[in-house]
């Protein structure tokens, strides 16, 4: 799980782009993370961001959190993975 300070950093970084929902999934959500784990974040933005903006946000989150971040948008989530993501998903902002 992530700390409330880490949640604040995530929300602060992503708030510039008006997210409708932000959640974590994967090993951090299940409490199975270790020092090699990345932090999987699912986000639904009000407006579409281009690839460079998403990469920039991912890098900013990685730098500010000190954890490798994978930023996934709701619209880019494949139908095959949707079930697994939703099963683990812990919303941190709506």
Language model: regions and residue ranges:
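Catalytic core of pol beta-like nucleotidyltransferases
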Residues: 1-23, 29-35, 46-94
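Conserved G/P- and acidic residue-centered "switch" motifs that form tight phosphate/ATP-binding loops
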Residues: 26, 40
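Short hydrophobic/aromatic beta-strand micro-patches
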Residues: 42-44
